[in-house]
């Protein structure tokens, strides 16, 4: 997911852990 990158960079990184 990269849509969160535009909203929040850190959220994108955390999302990677949640998805993974």
From Swiss-Prot:
Glycan-carrying positions: 4
Protein name: Pregnancy-associated glycoprotein 71D
Biological processes, Gene Ontology terms: proteolysis
Subcellular location: Secreted, Extracellular space
Keywords associated with the record: Aspartyl protease, Glycoprotein, Hydrolase, Protease, Secreted
Keyword check for Glycoprotein: yes
Native organism: Bison bonasus
Family to which this protein belongs: Belongs to the peptidase A1 family.
Other observations noted: On the 2D-gel the determined pI of this protein is: 3.7, its MW is: 71 kDa.
Statement: the UniProt record of this protein carries the keyword rRNA-binding: no
Listed EC numbers: 3.4.23.-
SS bonds (residue pairs): none
Gene Ontology cellular component terms for the protein in this record: extracellular region
Gene Ontology MF term list: aspartic-type endopeptidase activity
Tissue: Chorionic epithelium (trophectoderm) and placental cotyledons.
């Amino acid at each position: 997911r990269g849509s969160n990158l535009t909203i929040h960079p850190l959220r994108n990184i955390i999302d990677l852990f949640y998805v993974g």
